[in-house]
């Protein structure tokens, strides 16, 4: 199967998981990215069963609304039973690198209030040690040089994210992203705390303190489920 076929497989598995485990009238938490988009598409026929969804990005909001979902403000929602999102990398403890799509801060916020985080990914995303995928760090624009120096002191090689048009990439929150390569992340929780403590950092794309609870992994043999 192609990578796109594996993504579609896990997206449908996530839809099946939600339908089996989330009560009618609940609010869904929805992530960002290509696999999350396929999950949104798979849930579209069942939208009437749910009160609505909380989205982690403007892009996902547009896709949800295009399918007729009510997209709710997180401030108006008391509980989110399940948050479904992809990952750029995930290890065997459920710790993840996320943020390749630029929505790491909102993803982390929605994940933090969800009862359960269901990660959907193809088999290429499962790794022994995090860090081959450059680690995204969202930064207040005025602090980007100062933060970059501190990330370099931690052993990383930070690079300012740019658009295809050669402009500085801007998040939905109006910030910039430093993508940090060269890190071999043996202790994700420790590094997450270290980077979050740097003044000017909004958040880091390490999801270790609040990692995945369930992984639905698309493989040639089908969807594998892992619980953490």
Curated annotation (Swiss-Prot):
- Does the record bear Nucleus in its keywords? no
The Enzyme Commission number assigned here is 5.3.1.6
Q: How does the annotation summarize its subunit structure? A: Homodimer.
Report the HAMAP family cross-referenced here. Answer: Rib_5P_isom_A
**Gene Ontology BP annotations:** D-ribose metabolic process; pentose-phosphate shunt, non-oxidative branch
Q: Where substrate is bound, by residue?
A: 32-35, 85-88, 98-101, 125
Q: What S-S linkages are listed for this chain? A: none
Key words of the record? Isomerase
Q: Which residues form the signal peptide?
A: none
Gene3D superfamilies, alphabetically? 3.30.70.260, 3.40.50.1360
Q: What's one GO MF term for it?
A: ribose-5-phosphate isomerase activity
Which family would the database say this protein is a member of?
Belongs to the ribose 5-phosphate isomerase family.
Quick one: a GO cellular component term? cytosol
**Which reaction does this chain catalyze?**
aldehydo-D-ribose 5-phosphate = D-ribulose 5-phosphate
Q: Does the keyword Isomerase apply?
A: yes
Q: What is this protein called?
A: Ribose-5-phosphate isomerase A
Question: Quick one: which pathway?
Answer: Carbohydrate degradation; pentose phosphate pathway; D-ribose 5-phosphate from D-ribulose 5-phosphate (non-oxidative stage): step 1/1
Q: Which InterPro entries match?
A: NagB/RpiA_transferase-like (IPR037171), Ribose5P_isomerase_typA_subgr (IPR020672), Ribose5P_isomerase_type_A (IPR004788)
């Amino acid at each position: 199967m192609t990578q796109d076929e594996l993504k579609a497989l896990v997206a449908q598995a996530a839809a099946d998981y939600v339908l089996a485990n989330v009560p009618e009238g609940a609010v869904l938490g929805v992530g960002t990215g290509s696999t999350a988009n396929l999950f949104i598409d798979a849930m579209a026929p069942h939208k009437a069963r749910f009160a609505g969804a909380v989205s982690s990005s403007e892009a996902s909001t547009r896709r949800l609304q295009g399918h007729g979902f009510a997209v709710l403000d997180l401030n108006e929602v008391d509980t989110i039973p399940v948050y479904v999102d992809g990952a750029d990398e995930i290890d065997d403890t459920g710790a993840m690198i996320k943020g390749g799509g630029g929505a790491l801060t909102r993803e982390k916020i929605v994940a933090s209030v969800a009862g359960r985080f269901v990660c959907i990914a193809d088999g290429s995303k499962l790794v022994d040690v995090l860090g081959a995928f450059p680690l995204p760090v969202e930064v207040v624009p005025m602090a980007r040089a100062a933060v970059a120096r501190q990330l370099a002191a931690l052993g990383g090689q930070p690079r300012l994210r740019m658009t295809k048009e050669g402009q500085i990439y801007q998040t939905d929150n109006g910030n910039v992203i430093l993508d940090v390569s060269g890190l071999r992340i043996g202790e994700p929780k420790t590094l997450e705390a270290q980077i979050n403590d740097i003044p000017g950092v909004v958040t880091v794309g390490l999801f270790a303190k609040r990692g995945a609870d369930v992984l639905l992994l698309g493989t040639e043999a089908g969807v594998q489920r892992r619980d953490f």
